[in-house]
Amino acid sequence: MSYNCCSGNFSSRSCGDYLRYPASSRGFSYPSNLVYSTDLCSPSTCQLGSSLYRGCQEICWEPTSCQTSYVESSPCQTSCYRPRTSLLCSPCKTTYSGSLGFGSSSCRSLGYGSRSCYSVGCGSSGVRSLGYGSCGFPSLGYGSGFCRPTYLASRSCQSPCYRPAYGSTFCRSTC
């Protein structure tokens, strides 16, 4: 089964913990092992390899100028980033600056190499190390390490915290 969780050049959908964006665009290089497609997203079960993840969320990526991000549905959060410079572009509700970079409204720093992730609107929280391949979750290339602190069985909500390319760190809630 293939997933339908992406749309647009700089407006990319994510499904579960996996961020989707183009391999390259406007002269900027992105990790080529992250999946990108132009399909429209629907809040259904999506597949990446042999793993299934529920819930879709939109994150806006624009290397030169930030687009306006918006909350797609009540429990879910969206953010806008400049991935090359790791600058949070707004309009996130709350932001912080931690030891590993900039983050969105669902993250708090617990010191170097760790984050406490709070799934705003879902009521879950958790703490995991951000080391490469730790937490038993896959480590993608270019310094990406994925962690999923908490999953609520009552709702399809997760609070993944991960370090993408270029050493930046941010967390988001996915519902």
Curated annotation (Swiss-Prot):
Sample GO molecular function, one term: structural molecule activity
PANTHER family: KERATIN ASSOCIATED PROTEIN 3-3-RELATED, KERATIN-ASSOCIATED PROTEIN 26-1
Record protein name field: Keratin-associated protein 13-2
Known partners and oligomeric status: Interacts with hair keratins.
Top-rank lineage group of the source organism: Eukaryota
Membrane-spanning parts: none
The species this protein was found in: Homo sapiens
Signal peptide residue numbers: none
Family stated for the protein in its record: Belongs to the PMG family.
UniProt-listed InterPro entries: Keratin_matx, KRTAP_PMG
Function statement: In the hair cortex, hair keratin intermediate filaments are embedded in an interfilamentous matrix, consisting of hair keratin-associated proteins (KRTAP), which are essential for the formation of a rigid and resistant hair shaft through their extensive disulfide bond cross-linking with abundant cysteine residues of hair keratins. The matrix proteins include the high-sulfur and high-glycine-tyrosine keratins.
Keywords: Keratin, Repeat
